[in-house]
Every structure is written in structure tokens, then in C-alpha cells.
């Protein structure tokens, strides 16, 4: 038989006082809105990548890519407390210093610029249909891998933004 004393109930309620704090709820709503806004660009890239596949494989690639990307995002969230501590300068160049976190963001941003440039070039310039060596379609797992990598990069940006907001409110 379990006996719950009045003191135990009061201690639990004291530890749950954060539930009634309006600033916590405002912060949660703000984080959700930020994640939604920052997630839109991710969906655009996923749609562009999935379009390279034959129509029969597009939905499967989107679902598989998003499921794997969700796992990647959960791993990133679990390790974010470690990631935000990577502020010790690794490279110093004149007056500029770069930490591991800065380098991750820099290379992620460069990858996104490269990917966006390649996609825009393909769409604006078109493909040379007379070229017999040109690939007819993308490979399923190559597209899924690109979806996961792009989601990881976009997640890194939004998770660091969210952690920065939470640290600011403390």
C-alpha cells in the first residue's frame, strides 16, 4: 500500500509551479512559431529533391527522408547542450576567431549555398536532353541521403536559435 502524505503532495506542487508561469508558455509558443518558420525552407528543399525521382518513388522518398531526418533532429537535440559549449576558438585568423560551432555553421551554410546554386542552375538553364551521358533520374537513396543532410543543417540552425532563446530567458 502506498501512502501519500500532505508534505509529499506539496513538494510535488512546488516543483510544478513552472506550469503556471505565463513566460514559460509564451516561450513555448515562440519556439513553436520559430520552428515552423525555419522549417518552411526545409520543406521547399525536400520538395525540390523529391521531384528528381520518378513519380512512383517521390512519396516514399519524402516519408523515408523525413523519418530519418526526424531521428537526426532528435539526436541533434539530445546533443545540443554539448554543441553550444563549443565556443573555444579553434582557428584564429587576424582578428577573427572560429570555434567548432562557428565552423559547423559556416560549412553548413556553404553547403546550403552550393546546393541552392546547383538547383537554381538546373532549373534556370535546363538540362541538355541531347547529351546521352546525362542521368535520366536521381537514385532513391541518394535523394533520401540529401534530405537527411539538409534537414540536419537546417535543424542545427533552428536548434541553436531555440537554445539561444532559452538561455536568454534564464
Curated annotation (Swiss-Prot):
Family recorded in the similarity comment: Belongs to the TerC family.
InterPro entries: Integral_membrane_TerC (IPR005496)
GO cellular component labels: plasma membrane
Pfam families linked to this entry: TerC
Protein name: Uncharacterized 18.9 kDa protein in cps region
Amino acid at each position: 500500500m502506498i501512502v501519500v502524505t500532505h508534505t509529499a503532495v506539496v513538494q510535488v506542487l512546488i516543483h510544478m509551479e513552472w506550469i503556471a508561469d505565463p513566460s514559460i508558455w509564451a516561450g513555448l509558443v515562440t519556439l513553436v512559431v520559430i520552428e515552423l518558420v525555419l522549417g518552411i525552407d526545409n520543406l521547399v528543399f525536400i520538395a525540390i529533391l523529391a521531384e528528381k525521382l520518378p513519380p512512383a518513388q517521390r512519396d516514399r522518398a519524402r516519408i523515408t527522408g523525413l523519418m530519418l531526418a526526424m531521428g537526426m533532429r532528435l539526436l541533434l537535440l539530445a546533443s545540443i547542450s554539448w554543441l553550444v559549449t563549443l565556443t573555444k576558438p579553434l582557428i584564429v585568423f587576424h582578428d577573427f576567431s572560429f570555434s567548432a560551432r562557428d565552423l559547423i555553421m559556416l560549412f553548413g551554410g556553404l553547403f546550403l549555398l552550393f546546393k541552392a546554386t546547383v538547383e537554381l542552375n538546373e532549373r534556370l538553364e535546363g538540362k541538355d536532353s541531347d547529351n546521352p551521358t546525362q542521368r535520366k533520374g536521381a537514385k532513391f537513396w541518394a535523394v533520401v541521403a540529401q534530405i537527411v543532410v539538409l534537414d540536419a543543417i537546417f535543424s542545427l540552425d533552428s536548434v541553436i536559435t531555440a537554445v539561444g532563446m532559452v538561455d536568454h530567458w534564464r
